[in-house]
């Protein structure tokens, strides 16, 4: 028994000595290698050699793979630590700046609602709530019934204004119905239907003066004239032409165009309406050449011929001989005793009497005097000197001869 104990003690000492040597050798290898980030003891490798291999491929290549896995696990740990540190720093910074939109941490991020999306949704709702227009067209009977109702309301307004005017009250019924008149008669598709129901008679009643002789409100007059100017009345048709003549609307518009109480814009508008209707009714063209009749053109031609063949006023013989002074036109013509301006007329330049000249050709020239001859001679000399170039004269000591610039 003592021998066994001693043998066991020796075996344990040998193992301890081998372990110490392996530790020293392992540490030396680790110090020499720079690529490995951490110190790895070879004791673990020796222990692995003693253990039974779990897989068939437990060779040197397998050991290298295991080392790589261990290195990768160490790098992952460092990355996790860095992430944790960065998250903590970010949380600290967010708590200081009161930033709720942090990407780290367990806080729930609440995004503010977008205004543009809300506005777009509200606009869509508004359009969706609108009622769609009925695609079914109204029949002619329904349109006729509506036109008759409008005409009846407008006629009642005219009758009420007449009654109010006779009683001395303000006539404001037509003024209240004016928006209805503008709205209905401004619609182009309904104008033909209104003409068939006699709207021209209604408009004449709206424009004509009240029983006391006063004109309707200026807003009513201007609105009705504007409607008539834009109204489609096909006067080429005989039925429409007769309808316009029988309604008496033209007489009322003519009265407004010549009335002093009417404003100038309304008078111009009334004149335009009359000219437009009159040319169509009386078949007058708008060309300037066709606006005059043949008789008027003949009269204009005769006037031009008279102006061309008009002779000069007759002059007495005694006055014609003495032509030294200007002739007074008032003395030649018939003097009425009124000094007024006359319209200038063209004068034909066909003269029969030539005025006598003031110069006598037969008169002999008198002999010139000496001073006249000298003066002429000096003038000639000066002209000759000016024509030629300037020459400098020689100076004398006495100063008798001087330079002359002529």
UniProtKB/Swiss-Prot annotation:
Acidic residues: bias regions: 41-56
Entry annotated with the keyword Zinc: no
Segments of this protein annotated with the region Disordered: 1-28, 41-89
Composition bias type Basic and acidic residues, residue spans: 10-24, 69-78
GO terms, biological process: brassinosteroid mediated signaling pathway; regulation of DNA-templated transcription elongation
Key word Transcription present: yes
Any Pfam family hit: Med26
Loss of function: phenotype: No visible phenotype under normal growth conditions.
Annotated Gene Ontology cellular component terms: nucleus
Alphabetized UniProt keyword annotations: Nucleus, Transcription, Transcription regulation
Ranges of residues in domain TFIIS N-terminal: 201-284
Subcellular location(s) per record: Nucleus
Annotated InterPro entries: IWS1/2, TFIIS/LEDGF_dom_sf, TFIIS_N
Protein's job: Transcription factor involved in RNA polymerase II (RNAPII) transcription regulation. Involved in transcription elongation. May function at post-recruitment and elongation steps of transcription.
Family that this chain belongs to: Belongs to the IWS1 family.
Name this protein carries in UniProt: Protein IWS1 homolog 2
